[in-house]
Curated annotation (Swiss-Prot):
It is an enzyme of class 4 (lyase). This is Phosphoenolpyruvate carboxylase. It comes from Citrobacter koseri (strain ATCC BAA-895 / CDC 4225-83 / SGSC4696). Pfam families: PEPcase (PF00311). The active site is at 138, 546. It comes from the Bacteria. The gene is ppc. PROSITE patterns: PEPCASE_1, PEPCASE_2. Its cofactor is Mg(2+).
Length: 883
């Protein structure tokens, strides 16, 4: 066991040593000694030494304002380096995931061993694989892009240092490079000065494509193909690419007034520009490689006499010219110039595919398969995965914005107020207009700014090249009219094809009602005819957990999916469930494999569509090798879930879940909504108010500027509780409900559910993960430094609940300690705690100083404010998630 981690630990300590040298060079021996003392005290405090724990608190409380920032930065940067070492370890020869392509091999072996599955069935399941990853900017990646880039280089150095064969002088050069990179990071401000704009966020997404996915996706497909050949004797067709990427950056306007129609238009152009740029580099390589002369008569006919001497190069050069002309036109459009479209402007993937595929077929036919299956095949696969748009965009808007727009229109037309109509009247009006051949919008109408924005967004969708917009997502969808309203607005903008419109059900009531809403829609003749047998529905994880607590929310999500699957199956509709999961447990995050196998049977038949959020994008797709690993995990899980679906839960299990759901939701809401002390306690015990100052994402933290917990977005709500280590949204109510069911004599039933039902065992596993990141003494310390004494009893009550919850979960799982079955994660959390603890203590101290200055009417000390921001970023790195 320790053998496996010794490589990780030695890398972590080596990087820590280099960081120490950097700090000493920059700030002198005294600061380094101070940091080292704090680290040793923290380590000893973690090992249970109470005297050292007290000394740690005293030392951090007594830091001068000048010492605050260097100490905070030292621990924060160390955690970034530890995360980098861990990410490298996951793909290194010593790491557990060295075998990640092995995941696919393991899955294929497991499937072949099933007596009821033949190879043809497995092959069909492979051919219907579909994985769409939707990159979102929230909760925002807290680490700056420039530092991410440096950490990527540190990773590359670790990889080369792992090679035992390298000469001493090369090793010395690599160590010098590591020192340079760590010094560069130390002398770079880790906190952004300004909030990123939606366009900046989109560029961050494009950088992930360029630096990692562009190389990672073809390599993943190569790996998948090799495993399929070996285990099934089956080769992937050239045009088969089961993975696609979509983005919300620049398209998600829900609660973000900064994402306008103009911004979306700009991001669509920028995305196409980036695609031409990346394909030009590919084509340049192909021009240099494809110098061959032999070609089929078909290819020679295509190039004519002029290209006969080097037919492949000739075709590639003409494709290069088209790419360059397209890029120049896009560049002019981005600068605001109106130019006529050039002949041969690339707007569809086929225009890229055809010349490349013609070369591929000719090379294969002329016995040059080895060449065809090199760079050329990679480029063909990139055309299928990324294509002309690079990433497609989802548009997301809140349902009330569409209702308000139609209300304004009907009032102008003098036919009443749509907003105040009953649901039946709204539906009758919408269906009548959807069936009508005449336009609804009067030319002379001057709508309000908000309504104009909604209409212009639909206009942008109508103008965009076919295939560049993936779906229109309606957040806070509650009724059939919410869906029909969007279809009508799109029709009025001139969109004639069946653009996927996905209602997002995200509160407990809406999830419970989702099946009824979709059943009503599918009973409408116009609707059934229009959607052509396909429906997408999005399931909201974060808002439902914030609304009802994690246990009730996860059961409502399961039941909603289960009912929708059955309804669509009966109606002959192909359903795609779109999962709006976050990286953190309170927002539905779970290790991919476990999460997918815990869904209802049949939930992945229409493929997997899932959001990949801000900081998780870097952990899962930050490097090409990590991308291969993540995509392989998803592939294995989807195949397994479709061919060996989890069992239907027994009725008695469903009853127990209903019971757990009611008890946990009552307890959760009893605190969060009904306890008058809760909101003041939350505001003072966590850095919730200070988080708003962090220039994180382009989106405001609240849907409405005033208001309590209910108006706070799910992300800052979870981020705040993660910072003070109480992790409350991810467990409150769950353990109490389990305890009650145990007291009712059902422990053996719970143990059976844990053993035989992936949904339930994943829930408990996620609770264990949260418990191992939560910390009772730190949460108590925040109370002592920041909370009025009158509110201390509430904090104590919550911590007692947490301690009880941990005992209950361990009893049901039959374990003596947390994460017993995932030692690798337990090890990783332990490793980071030594560095995260001082940041937490320091953060509480900084919050205390900052709030005291505010109470005394003094200006905040910039050193305190800056150090506070650094601790927030550092704790996020230590917890491996923001919100």
């Amino acid at each position: 066991m320790n053998e496996q981690y010794s490589a990780l630990r030695s890398n972590v300590s080596m990087l820590g040593k280099v960081l120490g040298e950097t700090i000493k060079d920059a700030l002198g021996e005294n600061i380094l000694d101070r940091v080292e003392t704090i680290r040793k005290l923290s380590k000893s405090s973690r090992a249970g030494n109470e005297a050292n724990r007290q000394e740690l608190l005293t030392t951090l409380q007594n830091l001068s304002n000048d010492e605050l920032l260097p100490v905070a930065r030292a621990f924060s940067q160390f955690l970034n380096l530890a995360n980098t070492a861990e990410q490298y370890h996951s793909i290194s020869p010593q790491g557990e995931a060295a075998s990640n392509p092995e995941v696919i091999a393991r899955t294929l072996r497991k499937l072949k061993d099933q007596p009821n599955l033949d190879e043809a069935t497995i092959k069909n399941a492979v051919e219907s694989l579909s994985l769409e990853l939707v990159l979102t900017a929230h909760p925002t990646e807290i680490t700056r892009r420039t530092l991410i880039h440096k950490m990527g280089e540190v990773n590359a150095c670790l990889k080369q240092l792992d090679n035992k064969e390298i000469a001493d002088y090369e090793r010395n050069q690599l160590m010098r490079r590591l020192r340079q990179l760590i010094a560069q990071s130390w002398h770079t401000d880790e906190i952004r000065k300004n909030r990123p704009s939606p366009v900046d966020e989109a560029k961050w997404g494009f950088a992930v494509v360029e630096n990692s996915l562009w190389e990672g996706v073809p390599n993943y497909l190569r790996e998948l193909n090799e495993q399929l050949e070996e285990h099934l004797g089956y080769k992937l067709p050239v045009d088969f690419v089961p993975v696609r990427f979509t983005s919300w950056m620049g398209g998600d306007r829900d609660g973000n007034p900064n994402v306008t129609a103009d911004v979306t238009r700009h991001v669509l152009l920028l995305s196409r520009w980036k695609a031409t740029d990346l394909f030009l580099k590919d084509i340049q390589v192909l021009i240099s490689e494809l110098s061959m002369v032999d070609a089929t008569p078909e290819l020679l006919a295509l190039v004519g006499e002029e290209g006969a001497s080097e037919p492949y190069r000739y075709l590639m050069k003409s494709l290069r010219s088209r790419l360059m002309a397209t890029q120049a036109w896009l560049e002019a459009r981005l600068k605001g110039e109106k130019l006529p479209k050039p002949a041969g402007l690339l707007t569809q993937n086929e225009q890229l595919w055809e010349p490349l595929y013609a070369c591929y077929q000719s090379l294969q036919a002329c016995g040059m398969g080895i060449i065809a299956n090199g760079e050329l095949l990679d480029t063909l696969r990139r055309v299928k995965c990324f294509g002309v748009p690079l990433v497609r965009i989802d548009i997301r808007q809140e349902s009330t914005r569409h209702t308000e727009a139609l209300g304004e229109l009907t009032r102008y037309l003098g036919i009443g107020d749509y907003e105040s109509w009953s649901e039946a009247d709204k539906q009758a009006f919408l269906i009548r207009e959807l069936n009508s051949k005449r336009p609804l919008l009067p030319r002379q109408w001057e709508p309000s700014d908000d309504t104009r924005e909604v209409l212009e967004t639909c206009q942008v969708i109508a103008e965009a090249p076919l295939g560049s917009i993936a779906a229109y997502v309606i957040s806070m969808a509650k009724t059939p009219s919410d869906v029909l309203a969007v279809h009508l607005l799109l029709k009025e903008a001139g969109i004639s094809f069946a653009m996927p419109v996905a209602p997002l059900f995200e509160t407990l009531d809406d999830l419970n009602n989702a099946d009824a809403v979709m059943t009503q829609l599918l009973n409408i003749d116009w609707y059934r005819g229009f959607i052509q047998g396909k429906q997408m529905v999005m399931i909201g994880y974060s808002d439902s957990a914030k609304d009802a607590g994690v246990m009730a929310a996860s059961w409502a999500q399961y039941q909603a999916q289960d009912a929708l699957i059955k309804t669509c199956e009966k109606a002959g509709i192909e359903l795609t469930l779109f999962h709006g999961r976050g990286g953190s447990i309170g927002r539905g995050g779970a290790p991919a494999h476990a999460a997918l196998l815990s869904q209802p049977p049949g939930s992945l038949k229409g493929g997997l569509r899932v959001t990949e959020q801000g900081e998780m994008i870097r952990f899962k797709y930050g490097l090409p090798e990590v991308t291969i690993s993540s995509l392989s995990l998803y592939t294995g899980a989807i195949l397994e879930a479709n061919l060996l679906p989890p069992p239907e839960p027994k009725n008695s299990w469903r009853h127990i879940m209903d019971e757990l759901s009611v008890i946990s939701c009552d307890l959760y809401r009893g605190y969060v909504r009904e306890n008058k002390d809760f909101v003041p306690y939350f505001r003072s015990a966590t850095p919730e108010q200070e988080l708003g100052k962090l220039p994180l994402g382009s989106r405001p933290a609240k849907r409405r500027p005033t208001g309590g917990v209910e108006s706070l977005r799910a992300i800052p709500w979870i981020f705040a509780w993660t910072q003070n280590r109480l992790m409350l949204p991810a467990w409150l109510g769950a353990g109490t409900a389990l305890q009650k069911v145990v007291e009712d004599g059902k422990q053996s039933e719970l143990e059976a559910m844990c053993r035989d039902w992936p949904f339930f065992s994943t829930r408990l596993g996620m609770l264990e993960m949260v418990f191992s990141k939560a910390d009772l003494w730190l949460a108590e310390y925040y109370d002592q430094r920041l909370v009025k004494k009158a509110l201390w009893p509430l904090g104590e009550e919550l911590r007692n609940l947490l301690a009880e919850d941990i005992k209950v979960v361990l009893a049901i799982a039959n374990d003596s300690h947390l994460m017993a079955d995932l030692p690798w994660i337990a090890e990783s959390i332990q490793l980071r705690n030594v560095y995260t603890d001082p940041l937490n203590v320091l953060q509480a101290e900084l919050l205390h100083r900052s709030r005291l200055a505010e109470e005394q009417g003094k200006d905040p000390d910039p050193r305190v404010e800056q150090a506070l921001m650094v601790t927030i970023a550092g704790v996020a790195a230590g917890m491996r998630n923001t919100g």
